[in-house]
Design a protein with these regions (language model features):
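Internal maturation/activation junctions in enzymes
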Residues: 308-407, 419-420, 435-436, 444, ...
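Bacterial Sec-dependent N-terminal signal peptides
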Residues: 1-36
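Extended C-terminal subregions enriched in glycine
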Residues: 455, 497-545
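Alpha-helical support elements that line or immediately flank enzyme active sites
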Residues: 68, 154-162, 236, 240-243, ...
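Noncatalytic scaffold domains of N-terminal-nucleophile
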Residues: 34-62, 74-75, 79-236, 241-243, ...
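Active-site Gly/Thr loop motif
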Residues: 261-282, 357-383, 424-463
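Active-site rim segments in enzyme catalytic domains, especially the processed small/beta chain
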Residues: 87-112, 260-262, 400-468, 498, ...
Length: 575
């Protein structure tokens, strides 16, 4: 570490409500977006009337808020925030992964951008099976072969046609943070230390995330190779990533670990603009992501399965309300496993799966007071990571943006492209490696989500915007693998049905059921009396760590309330 930063290494920071380092003399004034990498606060709630950004890291939220204050719109802020997250939140923020964007523009137009990763052209259906046909999940989850063709950079530039500011302005703060470094948080230090062995095992060259001594809160993370990659993207647009030097470095990295992404795979990647899903729920309009995200379909199914039941009077986290929502989750995930896949490759009966009569039929065998059974509750009959990151943005004009991006697992494949400084995803594990075999999140699938060259793997990401009286009311989403749609589901119900404040809707304990395994996952601070009642109904309870990290913006009478989840370093900024 350079001598001028040595005092930072010894700094101890309590990262509860604030994060401060006494080195303001080193703060750099950056034209357009001022970023202090050594001194930044973490705000779990922010209010304003002009705009707001909520993301997984305080510096990224500040970058986005600054872009809004400089005259950028919500799309500008979302792009700049994503780029900043690629630097300051390397566990999931990325340029080596993919994601989805949902936007509702002030002119009433809805936008759905799909920049999900794709299987390389050399991918085969059984590429992760051994000679006996048994799955090798280490190959689909770890290292070079686990990586799909990245889509994030293509997604950023596909967003630019709705932006106001030049890309150079939007990427500048990220370049600065990567080149000069920033002070890491306590949780980031712990995460780097916990993953050190994997970084060493899965990389052929030193990475910025490994050093001889243990990381501590306040240490500087400098990523010069990443800064240079961002500069190439700044100067050459998408070609700065998908062609030229960066593409060469990606392919060279592939060769070191038997990866299969080629120059042609990179050059041929395109983001897709799809038709956003939009459906009513109790006098609100929910706008969310279509396939290849399963999240939108699952969310619609779950909300519609409970819409005409009196959940409001069941009360929040009562055994009755949790049971009702759990059984909706069970049925939606059973359908996910059976029917969903990339719509460009397989026929998916979306209209039937979201039909009100079909969903009523799905809940016909629901018995209040008695747990369902995933052995008998199968997919319906039709006629035909958790390491992700989310950001929510709104601007003064009423443009709202909800973005979820991912590397899949924490730090993706844990493989850094040598010389380019960014992590590759391990999204190939989101395919059905073998029908009925669960992925790292326990989700199962069948042939509809089987591996095929150029195919997009099924996702659970659920970026969502809720309108009230045709104007943005909620902008929300979360990381969390298969817990994403259930966390968004519960947050919407908390707000609309239970009338919670945004803070309570985000931070109250959550639960999750995904059909298989047939277990009800709950956070450790879940109500003990309710748990006993659920056990008496026949549910197998599995207490676990955090479920979701929701980023929520609410707009009421032009007052903006932005809330960042207490479960991480997440941060809200507004003005």
């Amino acid at each position: 570490m350079p001598m001028k930063y040595a005092n930072l290494s010894a700094s101890r920071i309590s990262f509860k409500k604030w994060f401060c380092l006494p080195v303001t003399c080193l703060c750099l004034l950056v034209t357009q977006a001022q970023v202090s990498r050594y001194h930044y606060t973490t705000d779990k709630k922010a209010e304003g009337r002009s705009g707001a950004v909520v993301s997984a890291h305080p510096l990224a939220s500040k970058v986005g808020r600054d872009i809004l204050q400089q005259g950028g719109n919500a799309i500008d802020a979302a792009i700049a925030t994503q780029l900043a997250l690629a630097v300051v939140y390397p566990g999931a923020g990325n340029i080596g992964g993919g994601g989805f964007l949902i936007a509702h523009l002030a002119n009433g137009r809805n936008i759905a951008l799909d920049y999900r990763e794709k299987a390389p052209a050399a991918a085969t259906r059984d590429m992760y099976l051994d000679a006996k046909g048994n799955p090798r999940l280490d190959l689909s989850q770890d290292g070079h072969l686990a990586a799909g063709v990245p889509g994030t950079v293509a997604g950023l530039f596909a967003s630019m046609k709705y932006a106001k500011l030049p890309f150079n302005t939007l990427v500048r703060p990220a370049i600065d943070l990567a080149e000069k470094g920033f002070a890491i948080t306590a949780s980031q230090a712990a995460s780097f230390n916990a993953h050190k062995k994997e970084f060493l095992k899965l990389n052929t060259a030193p990475t910025a995330f490994v050093k001889d001594k243990e990381w501590k809160a306040g240490d500087l993370l400098v990523q010069k190779d990443l800064a240079n990659t961002l500069k190439r993207i700044r100067d050459k647009g998408p070609a700065g990533f998908y062609e030229g030097e960066t593409a060469r470095l990606i392919v060279e990295e592939m060769k070191k670990g038997k990866g299969i992404i080629s120059l042609d795979d990179l050059k041929q990647y395109e983001a897709k603009e799809r038709t956003a899903m939009a459906f009513p729920y109790k006098k609100h309009l929910v706008i969310t992501m279509p396939l290849p995200s399963s999240g939108g379909i699952i969310l619609q199914q779950m909300l519609k399965m409970i819409e005409y039941r009196d959940i409001k009077n069941m009360k929040f986290q009562s055994a009755a309300s949790v049971q009702l929502m759990t059984e909706a989750e069970r049925r939606a995930f059973a359908d996910r496993a059976e029917f969903l896949g990339d719509p460009d490759f397989v026929k998916v009966p979306v209209q039937q799966l979201t039909d009100s009569l079909y969903l009523a039929e799905r809940m016909k065998d629901f018995e209040p007071g008695k747990a369902g059974n995933s052995k008998t509750t199968l997919a319906g009959t039709v006629k035909e990571s958790e390491e992700t990151t989310h950001l929510s943005v709104i601007d003064a004009a009423g443009n709202a943006v909800s973005v979820t991006t991912t590397l899949n697992g924490s730090y993706g494949s844990r493989t850094v492209v040598s010389g380019a400084g960014f992590l590759l995803n391990n999204e190939m594990d989101d395919f059905s490696v073998k029908p009925g075999v669960p992925n790292m999140y326990g989700a199962v699938g069948n042939e509809k989500n089987a591996i095929a060259p150029g195919k997009r793997m099924l996702s659970s990401m659920t970026p969502t915007i809720v309108l009230k009286n045709n104007k943005p009311y909620l902008v929300t989403g979360t990381p969390g693998g298969t817990t994403i749609p259930t966390s968004v589901f519960q947050t919407i119900v908390n707000m609309i049905d239970f009338g919670m404040t945004p803070g309570d809707a985000v931070n109250k304990p959550k639960f999750h059921h995904q059909w298989l395994p047939d277990e009800l996952f709950v956070e450790k601070d879940f109500d003990a009396v309710t748990l006993q009642q659920l056990k008496a109904m026949g549910y197998k309870i599995n207490a676990r760590g955090d479920i979701g990290r929701v980023e929520l913006i609410q707009v009421v009478n032009k007052k903006i309330t932005a809330v960042a989840d207490k479960r991480g370093d997440d941060d809200a900024k507004a003005y």
